[in-house]
Amino acid sequence: MGIRENGIMLVSRERERARRLENRESIFAEPPCLLLAHRISPSPSILPAEEEVMDVSARKSQKAGREKLRREKLNEHFVELGNVLDPERPKNDKATILTDTVQLLKELTSEVNKLKSEYTALTDESRELTQEKNDLREEKTSLKSDIENLNLQYQQRLRSMSPWGAAMDHTVMMAPPPSFPYPMPIAMPPGSIPMHPSMPSYTYFGNQNPSMIPAPCPTYMPYMPPNTVVEQQSVHIPQNPGNRSREPRAKVSRESRSEKAEDSNEVATQLELKTPGSTSDKDTLQRPEKTKRCKRNNNNNSIEESSHSSKCSSSPSVRDHSSSSSVAGGQKPDDAK
């Protein structure tokens, strides 16, 4: 039994060896004649020991190759880490590279956490700002509506208080009056101006209406502004030297107009005195001559004063006109007596 079992084991070993040899033809390059010889005449004492040695050597060589490849890859990775950390420094050992990478990772994680906290704070602040913005928009719309309501109430009050408020714009009514640095003329209606409403009608003038006498003055009467405007005019007049030459002409024209008005008033008073029923003709004729001389003296004095001053006004003509009307009015009760 023992011999038979040994024979079976040898046959099985030979078969396994044949299979291994067929699979490893590149490693164990043996000619086919030797293989046939081994198959025909196997040596059971020598072949198993050689096979075991070959298997162990092959395994060791494969393991060494794998280890070499793994170390080469690790070295490449360490070189890349060193270049990322500090490419200018020389090559360090693996321990320093690992410590530097660990420290850098810790710093990066702390920065990431800090940025996350800042992001959350900024998001909360942005929400608050958006809420405030919406509140301000609502307040703005409410204020606009209040302003519109107040404007409507103001317009309604203007229309109820003044009849012309409906036709005029409230912006025009609220605007301040313009200030002119010089006197502006006022437009008067064309026609005659009532001078002496108590005088009787005379056919000499050809006017049937006793209260209306043709006015010798033009249709525009000079407008006297307040004192502030006159002072502004006195400040602005020296800047224009051309106005000095125009002032005497205007004054002369105004004096001639006032003299014409005085002559017409004197003619009217003389005709009134020549009417029947007048007792003292000589006294009444002498009075207009005296008044005329006084008026001329007043005109000369006013011209001299105006030449020294820079103010431009039409007060002398208005005063002469008022004095002539007062003289004429003062003569009427004497004549009536």
UniProtKB/Swiss-Prot annotation:
Entry GO MF terms: DNA-binding transcription factor activity; protein dimerization activity; sequence-specific double-stranded DNA binding; transcription cis-regulatory region binding
A biological process from GO: intracellular iron ion homeostasis
UniProt-annotated location(s): Nucleus
A Pfam family reported for this protein in Swiss-Prot or TrEMBL: bHLH_IRO3
Tissue distribution of the protein: Expressed constitutively in roots, leaves, stems, and flowers.
GO cellular component: nucleus
UniProt feature, compositional bias: Basic and acidic residues: 244-263, 280-291
Major site of localization recorded for this protein: nucleus
Domain bHLH: 58-108
CDD domains, alphabetized: bHLH_AtILR3_like
InterPro entries membership: bHLH11/121 (IPR044579), bHLH_dom (IPR011598), HLH_DNA-bd_sf (IPR036638)
Keyword vocabulary terms for this entry: DNA-binding, Nucleus, Transcription, Transcription regulation
Complexes and interactors: Homodimer.
Protein name: Transcription factor bHLH121
